[in-house]
């Protein structure tokens, strides 16, 4: 997650790096995200981004902007699947972070979108974070003024 509107020290990648190092891990967390990016945008840069040497793990956090734009969940799933394949071809482990669509998009859209992440985790034997924004979503103190 790019951390749009957050000070740098509160970006997910920075907090993750700080926490892992404080636990004694010798690790570097690199933020490869782009604010506003969709799964298609992520797919466009995946080969290049994942060509860096010594990448052991990727946390895949794409799909939320697809949902906000009403992109067909089948397209989102296909793009995420291609990103996973690129990572796997490079022997990069993948953790996939899920998102949840609101009911305002309709129950069919919500059902189809919400299943993307667990389906891909099962197919590719990935570790799944069911809802990345658990404990953050719908809490005004953790969101932008527009509620996002």
Task: Enumerate the predicted regions with their spans.
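Serine-esterase "nucleophile elbow" of acetyl-processing enzymes
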Residues: 1-37, 45-54
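Alpha-helical cap/lid subdomain in secreted, periplasmic
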Residues: 15-18, 22, 41-148
